[in-house]
Each structure stands twice: as structure tokens, then as C-alpha cells.
Amino acid sequence: MVQEYDVIVIGAGHAGIEAGLASARRGAKTLMLTINLDNIAFMPCNPSVGGPAKGIVVREIDALGGQMAKAIDKTHIQMRMLNTGKGPAVRALRAQADKVLYQQEMKRVIEDEDNLDIMQGMVDELIIEDNEVKGVRTNIGTEYRAQAVVITTGTFLRGEIILGNMKYSSGPNHQLPSITLADNLRELGFEVVRFKTGTPPRVNAKTIDYSKTEIQPGDDVGRAFSFETTEYILDQLPCWLTYTNDRTHKVIDDNLHLSAMYSGMIKGTGPRYCPSIEDKFVRFNDKPRHQLFLEPEGRNTNEVYVQGLSTSLPEHVQRQMLETIPGLEKADMMRAGYAIEYDAIVPTQLWPTLETKMIKNLYTAGQINGTSGYEEAAGQGIMAGINAAGKVLGTGEKILSRSDAYIGVLIDDLVTKGTNEPYRLLTSRAEYRLLLRHDNADLRLTDVGYELGMISEERYARFNEKRQQIQDEIQRLTDIRIKPNEHTQSVIEANGGSRLKDGILAIDLLRRPEMTYNTILEILEESHQLPEAVEEQVEIQTKYEGYINKSLQQVEKVKRMEEKKIPEDLDYSKVDSLATEAREKLAEVKPLNIAQASRISGVNPADISILLVYLEQGKLQRVKN
């Protein structure tokens, strides 16, 4: 008997987990298929979550009702807030994960989730009828039927591991690759590219001389990604910093001909922002040294990840490199680094919902879409799961805009501009980064999560209480006038401010660069009555109000352009005067509105003006008819 589901998710990595959970939490009967149940939520590369932009994505996933933030909060070995000396727009959390505990926690959550079944099996083929996906077929011939399918295959599609002059078929960390499904996608007509990524060697902690390295401790205050976390892990493990040197670089130079990167064995394009050590040596040969972070992979293992030493050089050369690095001269290598090539689809073949344009109800998320990183994968996964379930159940799909979330920036970049290399999310990619902060992800997206059925009533009530507290406190400070008495003047001067000449509203005093919310309380001789997160919002919203308002005005302009819809079936060959490149790009991407069209590479303002005139003429013609 064929088993039937609403949604099937292929893969149980970081994208697959969020897709499966989101689909199930929206009420869809969901099946998650994975090659190996023991490798759910596996971290084949770095043992960390978060970082600039990426850490904000994790917070956004949490605000939408996803799981990554909660899992890392329970299983990390270290957590740090980055860029604390800079403005709030670029601050972000980064956590070192206990890889095994993280897997165990995610597996527990998935197994306990209502509406979600998990099955070990390798999908070989999509079942397509009348250009619409209807299910999947495994390598042993088992069929599972569904109204929607989400593909989250990571680097498994025709995966090949490369080490020196060796190349063999494999998924990450020597798991089984997915070859037949990769062939199936090509046969269906998808445009496929070949990408490459890599991983560094792991060394034995017992054989590291830490006295030659610099300690990198975590923060000594409680940190969390999830807005719901109330218990913090303060017993943290440090990381350590060391560097390459001239001797390391000589080993690389002497053996560069053995690197798969430079021997021609690797054809795939690698990630620009995470280059291999041999790539760093070639591209930045003026640098006398490169940073290497020694990151423990967990509390109950001696494996240490050598961040920054990603390589495809032969194993014996990797050992030679390690022998030149301070602290690692006698380190035992437990696993060799390697490069991996894999198939990815060209992401301009997707709608902003992550549904494929070619086959209805088929969604893709994660590295199959050309991205790098666990967080980018999870962000796509939750949206693909939300939209697959919403379409099947008739409860609606959701597209996050570039002003809503970094997830919106990520997906819009992929489906509008495409990518010719593994895509990494950066703060510089977001034009509204002052709006898309680490601290306000819940204020931006909890309403969305609640409307989608992903947020519980209890959580939503707590969120609304927080939001009201912020509004009330800003209003209270707006109503209080501070007099320039001796107490006030002394507090202001002690905090580096200039004396008041006249009375001033508390809210206006808080706007001064040197003033903090704590300073205002000290002047008012009040104790802390509100949660720290509320106080933080009051201060940030007040200090950056002018800049925030300017960003919001820009957002309104873009929203007006987004309201100018473009018919999905518009024949661009009939739009006179469009530049040839613009016509080709518009036909390929099929933008949903003028705002998206304006972001397509090769479409210039003149093309947009022509398109606007054409659409207006079409409206007038329909009115006359």
C-alpha cells in the first residue's frame, strides 16, 4: 500500500529539519526521508552556529517558530556576542556547538513532533504527473505520495570527495552520495551547476600545546539565540588562536601542484568567503600569516576543528603543514581535511516562495540552491516548509521582503540575481540592515509566525507584553522633564556629557551619544523595573530613531514599487524597446513586481520605465474592453 502525505521533505540536514518542522507545525501531514537516521542535523564542517548576519538569521528562524536557536542554546560549549564595539546593526551572536549533543537534541525534537514521520531511505526519483510533483520513489522502489515535495539534499547530489590526486563518489564526511536523484533532476530539465566546498583537518586536543596559542573565551554573561530561552550555559569551553607562518607557506608552495584546486581535478566553483588555505596562499601571498582558530567539537570528544585550514592537499602534506604551526607541532591528526564537489540548481529557476517554476508544488532549500552555511540553509528550509504546507492546506504562502528579514534578503538575492559561487549571507548585502538587527528579530517576525500558526498563544501573549512595555516606557520618558539640578549635572558629567542649561525631556537626553538607559535611571534615581531586553529596545529605538525613520521611508518607496505587479505569463518579446539583455533576464527570472524587476542584474532604469509604460497601457486597454 502506497503511503500518502501532504508534504514530503527529502533530507534531514539543517534545511530539511526546519522545512519538516514548519510543515508539520502548520498542520500538514509530513514525511521526512533521510539516507541515514544517525546523521540527522549533522555538522560536516564547522562546529558553530551564527556570526555576522548568519546569527541574525538564527534569531529570525526562532521568531518565526523554528528550532535552530533553541537547539544551539541547549547544546553549545561557548557563546559570544560579536561586534560589541560597533553599532547594533552589525552585532550578532556566534556559538560553538557540541556537534553530537546538537544532533541528539534535534533528533529528539523531530521524533516528538506531531504530524511528522521520519523514515530512512534514499530518494532516487520524483514522481511527476502533468508537470506537478506527486511523490517520490526510493532506491528500493518504495513509493510515497504527497501533494508537495521539498528537496533539501545539501552537498549529497553527485557528491565527490577530493583529496590530493584522489577523487571518489561520496557525500560529506564519507557518507553515501545521492547520484540517481541528481540525474533525475537533470533529466527533468533543471539547469544545474557544480559547486565546491571544503573542510580542514581535525586534531587531537591531548596533543596540542596550548601555551603557544592565544585563548579565546566565551562571554561570561548568559547569552541565547532564542527569545524563549531563560536558562543559560555558563560552563563554557574556550577556543584558541594560532597562526600560519613562512614555514607553513613553504609547505603549501612546495606542494601546490598536488592540490586538487590547482591540478585541474576540481571543476566546481568554491566559496569566495571561505577559501582553502592553498587558495589564501595564492590570492593573498603578501600576507605573512593567516589566523587559525582551534575549536573543540564537543565536551566528550578530543577532536578539535582547525578553523581556517580548509584544504584538499594530500594527507601527508596536511601533516607537514600542522608541524609548522605554533601549538600543533606534535598534534595528532584525527581526520584529514578534504574538498567536496556537488550539484546545485540555478536558483533563478525558483519563485520567491522557493517553489520551482518548472514543476508545481516542488520546493528546494539549502545548498541545493547554491548557498553555503547551516544558517542560510535553515532560513530557506523554514520558508520552504511554511510555503509547501500553506499551498497544500490552502492556508497561504509567505514571502519575506528585504526589509522584513535577512532571510528575505537571502532568498531575493538567490531567485532574482542567482549566484555563480556558493552564496554566503553578509551584512553588506542588506540595504536595510539598521532595521534587520539581532535585537529586534522578534519585533519584526513574531506576528508573522503567529499568523502562520507557528507561534503558541502563550508565547504570543508574552511577546505582546514585551512590545507594550517598550511602547509604554518610551512614552513615559517622553512625558518626564529632567531639571538641571546638581544631582542631574553631576551624573551627566560623570558619564562624559556636558552640563544642561535648561530642563530637558528624558527621551531627548537619552538621544545623546554618551547617555544610556542606565544613566537616565540614575538621574531619575530609579531602580531597574523592566526586563533587560525591553530596556535595550527603548535605548536603541530612541538613539537611532532618525536613521530608522529614514530607512522606513526608503522601505515605503520600495513597497509602492512592489504593489506594481507583473503578470506571471507576461511575454517580454512583445515589450517594444527593451534592451536584449533585459528582455532575456526578465523572461528568465519572471519577477513578480517592478521592485524585483529593478534588482535583476542587466535590467537598467530605462528598461524599468519602458516596462512600467507597457503595464500601464495594458491596464488602460483592459479598462476600455
Curated annotation (Swiss-Prot):
FAD binds at residues 11-16, 123, 178, 367. SUPFAM superfamilies: FAD/NAD(P)-binding domain (SSF51905). It comes from the Bacteria. Keywords: Cytoplasm, FAD, Flavoprotein, NAD, tRNA processing. PROSITE patterns: GIDA_1, GIDA_2. GO terms for biological process: tRNA methylation; tRNA wobble uridine modification. The keyword Cytoplasm applies. Its cofactor is FAD. One of its GO terms (molecular function) is flavin adenine dinucleotide binding. The keyword ATP-binding does not apply. It is found in: Cytoplasm. NAD(+) binds at residues 270-284. Gene3D superfamilies: FAD/NAD(P)-binding domain, GidA associated domain, C-terminal subdomain, tRNA uridine 5-carboxymethylaminomethyl modification enzyme MnmG/GidA. InterPro entries: FAD/NAD-bd_sf, GIDA_C_N, MnmG, MnmG-rel, MnmG-rel_CS, MnmG_C, MnmG_C_subdom, MnmG_C_subdom_sf. One of its GO terms (cellular component) is cytosol. PANTHER family: GLUCOSE INHIBITED DIVISION PROTEIN A (PTHR11806), PROTEIN MTO1 HOMOLOG, MITOCHONDRIAL (PTHR11806:SF0). Homodimer. Heterotetramer of two MnmE and two MnmG subunits. Belongs to the MnmG family. NAD-binding protein involved in the addition of a carboxymethylaminomethyl (cmnm) group at the wobble position (U34) of certain tRNAs, forming tRNA-cmnm(5)s(2)U34. This is tRNA uridine 5-carboxymethylaminomethyl modification enzyme MnmG. The gene is mnmG.
